[in-house]
């Protein structure tokens, strides 16, 4: 049976960035094949299926829309081929569209998920309008859980301002995510942090959660 990681979050949270970094980490640590199911048919600016050529040599398969596995496909079409991966011994990462649209889609997959070993993770960035503080984060997570018909099992802290990110963005967001996790009684699953910041912060912060350290952003070329 697959280990399933379902990733949601508001637009601009860095949800897809997290999916790719998580896939690279898992693929490097596990003997099982890792699959990313790119179900983001809404955000056309940055999608995990645009990284197919880079991820394949790492043993990471990307499942996109049903017409093709290419970046030219901008129609709102979803492949449900990823469901078969749940019956195989693979690591499956599901990259949902941001907000309620993605989680509404997930609700149709409930029968497949209920018996699976899964984590339903919400990526949060306190430097986005919908999730500026713990209270707004809590409201967002509750709406998402209701739409998906399954409970969010963990929160991911991803404080960033893309290429203008500083250490303070990481620490400030992390504090709000911790508060939100306490209110929701949900675990603070992970903090996503660039290597250069982690080296400075590891002596200042006692990271009780998992820490996903990355070297570079996997942004679209026209964003760099």
Question: At which residue positions do the language-model features occur?
Answer:
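Walker A (P-loop) ATP-phosphate-binding motif of ABC ATPase nucleotide-binding domains
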Residues: 4
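Hydrophobic anchor at the beta1->P-loop junction of P-loop NTPases
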Residues: 7
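The conserved Walker
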Residues: 11
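Conserved lysine of the Walker
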Residues: 15
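Hydrophobic positions on the alpha1 helix immediately C-terminal to the Walker A/P-loop
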Residues: 18, 22
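N-terminal phosphate/diphosphate-binding loop that engages ATP/GTP or pyrophosphate donors
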Residues: 25-74
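Switch II (G3) loop of P-loop NTPases
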Residues: 65-70, 90-105
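Conserved catalytic-core segment of NTP-binding enzymes
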Residues: 100-206, 221
